[in-house]
Amino acid sequence: MKIINSKQKALQELRRISQRTTSGDNKKINSIVENILQEVKFHGDIAVEKYTKKFDGFYPKPMQVSTRDLKTAWEETDQHLKKSLEVAYQRIKKFHEKEIPESFTIKGEFGDSVQRRWMPVKNAGLYIPGGRAAYPSTVLMNAIPAKVAGVKEISMVSPGNEKGKINTTVLAAAYLSGVDKVFRIGGAQAIGALAFGTKQINKVDVISGPGNIYVTTAKKLIYGFTGIDSLAGPSEILIIADRTANSSQIASDLLAQAEHDPLASSILLTTSNDQAQEVFDEVFKIIENHPRKEICIQSIKNWGLIAICENLESCVELSNEFAPEHLEIITIDPKTTLKSIENAGAIFLGKWTPEAVGDYLAGPNHTLPTCGNARFSGSLGVETFMKNSSIIEFNEKSLKINSVDIINLANSEGLHSHANSVKIRFED
C-alpha cells in the first residue's frame, strides 16, 4: 500500500489499479474456456460431469439438489441466521419491487397509438460462487430481483466442495428466495450448461452472478446465445474522508474489501496527512491477526492506495475518474460531497454506513460495476430479468396523414421498398 501526496501520481496509480484484470494469460484462458463451452454444447451433461470431476474433484450425480434437500437445509439453519436471512430478504424484496418498470401507451391525434410493454424473461440462470466459499447474500441479491421480475423458472448453479456438497446456508437462501432448481456444478461448464441447455438443465434467457476469471470469460463468450448481467471484475472500495473520520473505522472498511480476493482494491482519498499515516499503520496492525492474512497482504500490497489530496474537490475528481464499485463518503457533510459524485456503483454516506450494510441487507443490489464500468453502467436489478417490446398501431387516417413524411425519409435513405410499402396502401 502506497501513500501518495501528488494528485498526478495518484491519478496514474488509480489507472493502474483500474486495469488490474488485464493479463497476458487472457488468450490462454479464452482458449481453455472455448474448448469447455464447445464440449458442453455438443456433449451436454457428459461434458459437464467430466469437467466437474476434473476441476472440483467429484462427479455431480445426481446433478440437481432435490426439493427435499433444499427444504431440509432451511429447516436445519440456525434460528438466528434464519432471522437474519429473512430480514435481508424482506428489505431487498421491498427495494426491488420499486424497480419494476412501468409499461405505457401514447395515443396519437388521429387514432394511432404506440406502447412500451415490459415482460419478464421465461428462464433465468444464477451463478453462485461456491466450493470452499459460501455466499448466501449473493443468492438473495440475484434470486430476489428475478422473482420480482416474474421469471417463471429460476435455475441456480453452484460448485460443491470436495465432497460435492453445497453449503447449507447457500441452499437455505435459495429455498427462501424461491429458486426453482439448484445444480451442484460450477465453472465455465456450468455457464455453458445454462446457455446451451442439457438433458438435465433447461436453456436460460439470462445468466447473472459473479465468478472467477473462467466464469467471467465464459459469460463473455456465450453472450449472444443468452443474455448476461455484466462482466464483473475483482471487488473494490474507495473512501473519501476528511479529518473528522475515524481512522480505525476506515482501516476496517478497507480490509473488508481486501479480504475478498488478492485482486481486490482498497483506496483512501483523504485531506489529512495525519489520517493517512494513522490508517496505514492501523491496516497493517489489523492484518497481523487477520484470519485471511495472506489474501489481505496481497491485496493491500499490490492494489491498495492512500492518496493525500489538497481538498475534497480533488478527492471527488479522482473518485469520478476511478468510478469505484463501492464509494464511502465519511466527511463532515457527506451529502454536500455527494452532489459532485458522478461515477460510482453504490455510495455509502457517513460513518454509520459501512459498505457491509449494502453487501447484506440495506436493500439495493450488491452486484455492481467494477474496474471503471460505473462510468456507463449500474447495478443488477429487476430490469436485468426483463425485456421490452414496442407496440405500434396506425389506422388508415393516421398513416395517410404521416405518409408523406415517411416516404420522404425512406427516399432520403435510398430505400425504395420502404417508401413503396406506404404508397401501395393508398393506390386504387
From Swiss-Prot:
CDD domains: Histidinol_dh (cd06572). It is an enzyme of class 1 (oxidoreductase). The lineage of its organism: Bacteria, Bacillati, Cyanobacteriota, Cyanophyceae, Synechococcales. Catalyzes the sequential NAD-dependent oxidations of L-histidinol to L-histidinaldehyde and then to L-histidine. This is Histidinol dehydrogenase. Disulfide bonds: none annotated. Binds 1 zinc ion per subunit. The gene is hisD. It comes from Prochlorococcus marinus subsp. pastoris (strain CCMP1986 / NIES-2087 / MED4). Pathway: Amino-acid biosynthesis; L-histidine biosynthesis; L-histidine from 5-phospho-alpha-D-ribose 1-diphosphate: step 9/9. Its cofactor is Zn(2+). The active site is at residues 325-326. Keywords: Amino-acid biosynthesis, Histidine biosynthesis, Metal-binding, NAD, Oxidoreductase, Zinc.
